[in-house]
């Protein structure tokens, strides 16, 4: 099976802002362009699961407008990591000591004081990943962190203990990556 991991279009926030669980809109023109590009490459009748955050739902609905053969479903497990008190702040305004605390306990630290841990994110994304059918291709419209988690899950990695284990190669806004999965890979 093939899984398309699609990242939402650029958001309407200042560059360098932390916006994990923050529900912000994406740029409409970039969303339309991403939907148009994606519509041309997807096979007929795929199930499209989307994060409930508006930047992803915008892309899902734009894609459906071009491809009504697709089956849309919202899946809360595909929402981005909650960065707690960091949400809405500029990344460069967050104290280095906060990053150090996170990397010292990468798996279990509640990011931003009351946000999610990497372990919690991997668990919820793992649940969605485990429900993938071995025979049917699918699409996830989601976020950078969730795409990275799915990449790890596809490699059989269910948990990340250290920051250097987290994938560094990301997917740009409005772009996608495909994973070829065997039925055993998602069990």
Regions found by a protein language model. Give the residues of each.
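Generic beta-sheet signal
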Residues: 3-4, 46, 135-145
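Short, well-ordered beta-to-alpha junction loops that form the rim of enzyme active sites
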Residues: 9, 51-54, 77, 140-145, ...
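Short amphipathic alpha-helical segments
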Residues: 17-18, 60-62, 151-154
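Glycine-rich, phosphate-binding/catalytic loops in enzymes
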Residues: 21-23, 64-67, 91, 156-160
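Phosphate-coordination/substrate-recognition cap region in phosphate-metabolizing enzymes
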Residues: 36-99
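Domain-level recognition of soluble alpha/beta enzyme cores
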Residues: 155-186
């Amino acid at each position: 099976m093939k899984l398309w991991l699609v990242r939402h279009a650029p958001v309407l926030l200042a560059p360098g802002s932390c916006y994990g669980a923050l529900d912000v809109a994406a740029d409409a023109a970039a969303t339309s362009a991403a939907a148009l590009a994606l519509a041309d490459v997807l096979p007929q009748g795929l199930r499209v699961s989307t994060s409930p955050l508006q930047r992803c739902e915008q892309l899902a609905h734009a894609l459906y407008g071009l491809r009504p053969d697709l089956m849309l479903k919202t899946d809360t497990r595909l929402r981005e990591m909650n960065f707690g008190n960091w949400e809405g702040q500029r990344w460069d305004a967050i104290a280095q000591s906060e990053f150090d605390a996170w990397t010292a306990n990468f798996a279990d630290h509640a990011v931003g004081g009351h946000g999610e841990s990497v372990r919690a994110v991997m668990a919820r994304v793992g649940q969605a990943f485990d429900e993938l059918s071995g025979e049917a291709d699918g699409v996830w419209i989601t976020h950078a962190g969730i795409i990275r988690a799915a990449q790890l899950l596809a490699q059989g990695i269910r948990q990340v203990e250290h920051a250097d284990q987290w994938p560094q190669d990301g997917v740009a806004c409005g772009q996608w990556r495909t994973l070829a999965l065997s039925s055993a890979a998602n069990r």
